[in-house]
Amino acid sequence: MIIGIGTDIIEISRIERAIQRTNTFIERSFTCNEIAYFKLKGFKGNVVAGNFAAKEAISKAIGTGFRGFGLKDIEILRNELGKPIVNLSDKIYNLLEIKEFNMHVSISHSNENAIAYAVMEAI
């Protein structure tokens, strides 16, 4: 049963400006594992923006927005085929009434925008 959905779209140039403007944007927003993935991909703006949009979409699917947790409490990695894999911190699980669920995420981008869609499914 679907218990939450969320979507987010962001301009890739906005994320690129944030990366150029401050060294701390990446460190404040992403986990060490995500940063390692970005490094592997050459810190491309569309990759970073896609992960950022996914975090926003997940916060909306959860139904709280970023209340009680931060960006680094959501980790977006990839499996060997490139499918996004979501890891949530204990802080998020402690906020939720439902404890057993799957989080599905799709990330895409054009030349200008990145978009992510999240579906929270009860098990």
Swiss-Prot record:
Cofactor requirements of the protein: Mg(2+)
Enzyme class: transferase
SUPFAM superfamilies named among the record's database cross-references: 4'-phosphopantetheinyl transferase (SSF56214)
GO molecular function term, any single one: magnesium ion binding
Location relative to the cell: Cytoplasm
One example of a Gene Ontology biological process annotation: fatty acid biosynthetic process
Catalytic reactions of this protein: apo-[ACP] + CoA = holo-[ACP] + adenosine 3',5'-bisphosphate + H(+)
Superkingdom assignment: Bacteria
Keyword terms: Cytoplasm, Fatty acid biosynthesis, Fatty acid metabolism, Lipid biosynthesis, Lipid metabolism, Magnesium, Metal-binding, Transferase
Keyword Lipid metabolism assigned: yes
Binding-site residues, Mg(2+): 8, 56
Keyword Translocase: no
A GO CC annotation given for this chain: cytoplasm
Enzyme Commission identifier(s): 2.7.8.7
Record-stated family: Belongs to the P-Pant transferase superfamily. AcpS family.
Record function comment: Transfers the 4'-phosphopantetheine moiety from coenzyme A to a Ser of acyl-carrier-protein.
Entry protein name: Holo-[acyl-carrier-protein] synthase
Gene, per the UniProt record: acpS
